[in-house]
Amino acid sequence: MNTANTLDGKFVTEGSWRPDLFKGKVAFVTGGAGTICRVQTEALVLLGCKAAIVGRDQERTEQAAKGISQLAKDKDAVLAIANVDVRNFEQVENAVKKTVEKFGKIDFVIAGAAGNFVCDFANLSPNAFKSVVDIDLLGSFNTAKACLKELKKSKGSILFVSATFHYYGVPFQGHVGAAKAGIDALAKNLAVELGPLGIRSNCIAPGAIDNTEGLKRLAGKKYKEKALAKIPLQRLGSTRDIAESTVYIFSPAASYVTGTVLVVDGGMWHLGTYFGHELYPEALIKSMTSKL
């Protein structure tokens, strides 16, 4: 595990948030073993929250939960729930039951399970497109739906993990752009429908976050240097940037914030991302020509 992507006690002692901010709260996190969702969970746990880490891969899920639990005063504050496919509602529903049995309730939900790869439209199979949409969009729906009963009781908050790929045309990312556009729409709809119940619904849209799985998968070797020219703040994001924004959304400071997409990208999307540009347009032309 790259320690540059993890948090420690300095997040509390040198940060913006008091140590007991989320004392007595419980978070349900899908995709919690991934880099982004893990650091989100670490932040919540460091501030007193208990958490259920939900994932498909048993080893990764259990390792993530074990690592995060070391940050908590209560070493029994993190529950690993593995072998859960968010595309299967019954499996997510069962994970919710296990969480409530362990911790008694759910206050916060992070719907962060996601799938992505680099592929142009000509080579994107219907099954591959469906797979990403099902994991990202259907998985987010299933997560929110399965947690609804508990969120009604706690007047809790949902945070969907989105992106900015659907704000403009991004080559090789049509599948994830379509899925994330749906997530944004779902989050806004839930803000309207669940608001009267006291439930808040928001999205977080990370940009180019350094040392993450997503950046390594989507970016070429020369990406970092060239990408900076497309980021107004002239730096790549850090996992701590995501952690801070997540804490804000769940904190009382955002108690009147719902139906919002919080973009954490240094302003990058306003200039157009550099994702895929190393292959554009030559790779697309070659691909399209080969299909004729």
UniProtKB/Swiss-Prot annotation:
<dbReference type="GO" id="GO:0005777">
    <property type="term" value="C:peroxisome"/>
</dbReference>
<feature type="short sequence motif" description="Microbody targeting signal">
    <location>
        <begin position="290"/>
        <end position="292"/>
    </location>
</feature>
<keyword id="KW-0749">Sporulation</keyword>
<dbReference type="InterPro" id="IPR036291">
    <property type="entry name" value="NAD(P)-bd_dom_sf"/>
</dbReference>
<feature type="binding site">
    <location>
        <position position="145"/>
    </location>
    <ligand>
        <name>NADP(+)</name>
    </ligand>
</feature>
<keyword id="KW-0576">Peroxisome</keyword>
<dbReference type="GO" id="GO:0009062">
    <property type="term" value="P:fatty acid catabolic process"/>
</dbReference>
<feature type="binding site">
    <location>
        <position position="209"/>
    </location>
    <ligand>
        <name>NADP(+)</name>
    </ligand>
</feature>
<feature type="active site" description="Lowers pKa of active site Tyr">
    <location>
        <position position="180"/>
    </location>
</feature>
<keyword id="KW-0832">Ubl conjugation</keyword>
<dbReference type="InterPro" id="IPR002347">
    <property type="entry name" value="SDR_fam"/>
</dbReference>
<keyword id="KW-1017">Isopeptide bond</keyword>
<dbReference type="Pfam" id="PF13561">
    <property type="entry name" value="adh_short_C2"/>
</dbReference>
<feature type="cross-link" description="Glycyl lysine isopeptide (Lys-Gly) (interchain with G-Cter in ubiquitin)">
    <location>
        <position position="188"/>
    </location>
</feature>
<dbReference type="GO" id="GO:0005782">
    <property type="term" value="C:peroxisomal matrix"/>
</dbReference>
<comment type="similarity">
    <text>Belongs to the short-chain dehydrogenases/reductases (SDR) family.</text>
</comment>
<feature type="binding site">
    <location>
        <position position="180"/>
    </location>
    <ligand>
        <name>NADP(+)</name>
    </ligand>
</feature>
<dbReference type="GO" id="GO:0008670">
    <property type="term" value="F:2,4-dienoyl-CoA reductase (NADPH) activity"/>
</dbReference>
<feature type="active site" description="Proton donor">
    <location>
        <position position="162"/>
    </location>
</feature>
<comment type="function">
    <text>Auxiliary enzyme of beta-oxidation. Participates in the degradation of unsaturated fatty enoyl-CoA esters having double bonds in both even- and odd-numbered positions in peroxisome. Catalyzes the NADP-dependent reduction of 2,4-dienoyl-CoA to yield trans-3-enoyl-CoA. Dispensable for growth and sporulation on solid acetate and oleate media, but is essential for these processes to occur on petroselineate.</text>
</comment>
<feature type="binding site">
    <location>
        <position position="36"/>
    </location>
    <ligand>
        <name>NADP(+)</name>
    </ligand>
</feature>
<feature type="binding site">
    <location>
        <position position="85"/>
    </location>
    <ligand>
        <name>NADP(+)</name>
    </ligand>
</feature>
<keyword id="KW-0521">NADP</keyword>
<dbReference type="GO" id="GO:0030437">
    <property type="term" value="P:ascospore formation"/>
</dbReference>
<dbReference type="InterPro" id="IPR045017">
    <property type="entry name" value="DECR2-like"/>
</dbReference>
<protein>
    <recommendedName>
        <fullName>Peroxisomal 2,4-dienoyl-CoA reductase SPS19 [(3E)-enoyl-CoA-producing]</fullName>
        <ecNumber>1.3.1.124</ecNumber>
    </recommendedName>
</protein>
<dbReference type="GO" id="GO:0006631">
    <property type="term" value="P:fatty acid metabolic process"/>
</dbReference>
<keyword id="KW-0560">Oxidoreductase</keyword>
<comment type="subunit">
    <text>Homodimer.</text>
</comment>
